[in-house]
Amino acid sequence: MGRAFEYRRAAKEKRWDKMSKVFPKLAKAITVAAKEGGGDPAMNAKLRTAIANAKAQNMPKDNIDAAIKRASGKDGIFSEITYEGKAAYGVLIFIECTTDNPTRTIANIKSYFNKTPNASILTNGSIEFMFARKSAFEFRTDKNIEELELALIDYGLEELESRESEEGIYHIAYGDYKDFGRLSEGFEHLNIPISKAALQRIPTSPISLSETQMQDIEKLLDKIEDDDDVQAVYTNIE
């Protein structure tokens, strides 16, 4: 059980890192944010967060600037769409995409499921209710964490987790997805730099898998996450 848990935790961390280090995906997030709220980060909290995520992954400034400018051009038109599916062992998969060609994207997503035994695409709405939408902010700080927690409650904080990695202790703040902007502003007001920030979908009834089962499921998840149009993948695996 211990080894399986460690594998699942490492797999989830690997997926987050792999997703966030792909510059094209980061660029799309910046372009979409600029398209929605304007290209001035000072007036657009979503854009500020997208830029912060990109900088945390060492994305060059020229790439960031180009992604913002793309929002005002014809090639800056993207659709944000979701897909739902299931796989072996009771695994549920929720996929968020940003694409300039939905026909291409759904064809690719379907092919990943069709080529995987015991996996299939579901009708949208089939499993969305089994995930709670949350704002998530990862950060490191030397400040008193209890005092910081109390301060962040005023900005919509619901839960604060502390975890340990090779680089030391880091924290993840969770809030309702509607409070993403408020929490982002809270971190700015408190001068706490954010390492990563995103809207996440947390499973309400997570399931446990063995290490062997997890390795099997990872094959499908890797295919999905390698798709350039895929921004995030969520499962009900704990």
From Swiss-Prot:
GO terms for cellular component: cytosol. GO terms for molecular function: DNA binding. Pfam families: TACO1_YebC_N, Transcrip_reg. The keyword Cell cycle does not apply. It is found in: Cytoplasm. GO terms for biological process: regulation of DNA-templated transcription. Keywords: Cytoplasm, DNA-binding, Transcription, Transcription regulation. It comes from the Bacteria. Belongs to the TACO1 family. This is Probable transcriptional regulatory protein HH_1604.
